[in-house]
Amino acid sequence: ISITVNRFYKNPKYQSFKSNIHIFIDDKLANGTWPTTYIDNILEINPDCKIILNADWYYLEIFSKYRNEKNIFWIKLNLISSFFDNFKTDLTKIVSMGGGVVECAISLSIFLGSKNLNILGVEGNGISRLMCNQDSHFDGEDGDYDNHNSLMFANDMISSARSIRQWHRISHLLDKRNINIYNLTKEGILDAYEYKSFDIATK
């Protein structure tokens, strides 16, 4: 099973494997920062891909055309506690997430029966790179942040800090469940999960 998220479908490498599942839960898709044509683009490139959307968006007018789309699934989300084991992976009820879409993908992978999870392309230092006017994504700088001021970056850092704590929390919870999780990206700060080379993971 391969799961991709957000704008990864724009990566040239996407054409080589075309994921089974793609997830959008970022509010940027609901508030207009990202166009809903992202969904159309994925279905055009990869017609068999199952797309996961946030159930809170179901009745928003901009998503009305997708309500009866057979390859789109709407899921309810629940934040992971840093103190209690409320990590839920039952897709038929509610799926846990932490600071964002990566944690949701982990929950979904476990629900689908995965015991060995590999994460690729998560560095965890995107906000700090943007603050230093450096490229933060595979396609360069993120245009979503062109008009960001210091307060907006401060709020983003709070969200990033929560995500990092959630990665470590998930690592602890998965260890208790005998589920292995690996990081295939050597750059960045994602040290909550053991590093494994991409070549070994794809043998």
Give residue ranges: language-model regions.
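Metal-ion/cofactor- or nucleotide/acyl-coenzyme-handling active-site neighborhoods
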Residues: 1-203
